[in-house]
Amino acid sequence: GGLSLLGGIILLSLAAHTFSIQTMIEKVSDIQNSPFFILAMVLVMIGAFTKSAQVPFYIWLPDAMEAPTPVSAYLHSATMVKAGLYLIARMTPIFAISEGWVWTITLVGLVTLFWASLNATKQQDLKGILAFSTVSQLGMIMSMLGIGAVSYHYNGTDSQVYVAGFIAAIFHLINHATFKGALFMITGGVDHSTGCLLYTSPSPRDQRG
């Protein structure tokens, strides 16, 4: 993921002759007419999907739940998993002209949302439940960014869809960081008090209600 992102940024810099994202946006026509455009777009998406744990690159995030509680809270709520989402939001003015960008981001986000939600219901470890719920929320935000980018194809960047999609995505990004960090700290309190994080109810459905 990191190497893909590095490759994408290098290709963008070759097309725009700068490493500044703001300047790249100002030179968006040069980038879109560059032979590097498609490859750069694919590499940036791969980098973003791995950083924000999208399907099929999500497995590292549930594994990270084994870390100490403060580390888990940071990984699952702060900059670590939000970096890919921020990258997609910043790069949308450059790549949204491509339908491939819009459809890929939207569909990957939706698949991640439903796949991770389903897996969360199968977990018995409290941290596992929270980890997969984090993946599903990241998928929701990713799909919001994709839906917001649809406006580039019919009414420009000032359309209500674009504004609503991106405001919703950024709001939920901040909202998710707040409640998920708190939930992981609460889970740490449960672990400290009981010495166990396994949910052992006779009826697994109790944890889903």
PLM feature spans:
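...captures the hydrophobic TM-helix bundle architecture rather than a specific catalytic motif
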Residues: G1-R205
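N-terminal low-complexity segments that are often proline-rich with Ser/Thr-Pro
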Residues: Q207-G209
